[in-house]
Regions:
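Membrane-embedded alpha-helical bundles that constitute the cytochrome b-like, heme-associated redox core
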Residues: 1-210
């Protein structure tokens, strides 16, 4: 008998790492161009617009939307089964396990809002191109929007980087307590680095650094 749960969990982690992790990294690196000002970010966004619309839409659906739906739906199933007891046990791994689930729930709501507004409504319905000026106006329009956007980005970064360590353990790449501890430490270092970059480009919309 085929163990469907075994393969589903591995596919879930693989999709999260490659498809969604790749999209997050592209998102962060592109937005980091804002540190160089409007011209730098608009130049990056203009390069993406050079991709033919049918191909770009196909990539959005096939490489992002469908993997996200699978990761989200199966992730909800995992969350519903998970039992988090960070305060009872107090171990770092258990806290990471809990935060992985908590950020998953938050990200589900955040991405519906963020993608629904910017990609589907502003760009899709209104036909307004995404530019530095638009993003700046968006994130500085209200302290609530800024805080929610920043928390959403940081939650996505933690979910991704902690997911890397989980992926390495799930797939048997790192074995033993020492190797797993090193993997966890490296993933948190990456989390800190990406978080600092994100905070920097978010703040730059208020105080240009170029």
């Amino acid at each position: 008998m085929i163990n469907t749960t075994f393969y589903a969990r591995r596919l879930h982690s693989l999709v999260g790492l490659l498809a969604l992790g790749g999209f997050l990294m592209e998102h962060i690196l592109t937005n980091a161009s804002a540190l160089g000002g409007a011209e730098a970010l608009n130049g990056k966004l203009a390069m993406m617009e050079l991709i033919p619309k049918p191909i770009f839409l196909g990539l959005e659906i096939g490489a992002v939307a469908i993997p996200f739906l699978f990761h989200a739906i199966y992730g909800i199933y995992i969350c519903m089964q998970a039992k988090n007891n960070p305060t009872k046990y107090g171990y770092l791994n258990n806290w990471n396990f809990a935060f992985q689930r908590w950020t998953a729930w938050f990200l589900l709501v955040f991405l519906v809002w963020h993608v629904g507004y910017l990609r589907c409504y502003v760009k899709g319905v209104l036909g307004t191109p995404i530019t530095y000026e638009l993003i700046q106006s968006y994130v500085t329009s209200s302290p609530i929007v800024f805080v929610l956007y920043l928390i959403g980005m940081l939650a996505a970064i933690f979910h991704f980087t902690n997911g890397i360590a989980t992926f390495l353990m799930t797939w048997g790449v790192v074995k033993g307590p020492r190797a797993q501890k090193v993997a966890g430490l490296l993933s948190m270092m990456l989390c800190a680095a990406l978080s600092l970059v994100t905070i920097a480009f978010m703040v730059s919309y208020f105080v240009p650094m170029h």
